[in-house]
């Protein structure tokens, strides 16, 4: 498969998959070289509580960024954030991939019901969330800054 404008001799990276579409048989590919990473969000997200890209990745990893964070989240029905994020310093975009997901904002509740529904909130807007059905959401936040992790049982986790 070649993209428009791509040299016919340019190598093509593919994610290697086993099993059928939607099965658990998919394999994440890894670093192709020091500047390219090919992966599968469903598997890669498990390593950092959903976070695929941000300041918390190793500096030599192509997924390291001080500018932006990206999270792939799979939430079971009735999953809820343990506590509100207060004193937010980032801007965030949350996109519903599947399911039914509610974002709680001060004085307002936003229900994402259809694939592609999204909400954006800026600096200083506290928030929380609740999965009304099993849901998959993609979150993009900027800039990428330490903090905000909800302490997990037995200590703080890498991200929230």
Label every model-predicted segment.
Residues 86-102:
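Short, conserved beta-strand element in jelly-roll/cupin
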Residues 144-160:
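Short peripheral tails and domain-boundary helices/loops at the edges of structured domains
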Residues 107-123:
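Short acidic-glycine-tyrosine-enriched beta hairpin
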Residues 61-64, 81-88, 105, 111, ...:
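Short histidine-centered beta-strand/loop micro-motifs
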Residues 123-148:
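Ligand-binding loop in jelly-roll beta-barrel domains
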Residues 1-77, 81-84, 157-160:
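A short, N-terminal "cap"/entry segment at the start of jelly-roll beta-barrel domains
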